[in-house]
Amino acid sequence: DQGAGDFLSSHVYFKPYRFRRDKRGRAVILSEFGGYNLREKGHCFNDVDFGYKKLPDQAALWQAYEKLYETQILPAIPRGLCATVYTQLTDVEDELNGVLTYDRRVVKLPADRLRGLNRRVLDASPKA
């Protein structure tokens, strides 16, 4: 965060996210987090295998993703966390940390469980 604009932007990958209010009263956004890596053979651009945390299979990826939300994101919402951006929606050339593979043919996280977790995020959010 550069200290300007309408929101405090944080990128957190290597340590647990700890919510903190902005001293200027701006909205607090976790604008990059996660980055969990899962290689789906046959669905990658090349052999480069970058991600912030490598997981062996879809079950382990889901467990890590769900734990991340349950221990860090959901508790921060009532305290004032306004938005999050998981890294990342799709794999790209040299990064395998997407929810979808590079070719968009494999969804790495179970859609029904992801929908349920997203519902919990919405339910935890303050009502206007």
Predicted segments with their positions:
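Substrate-binding/catalytic cleft of secreted carbohydrate-active enzymes
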Residues: 1-105
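Catalytic cores of secreted or luminal carbohydrate-active enzymes
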Residues: 101-127
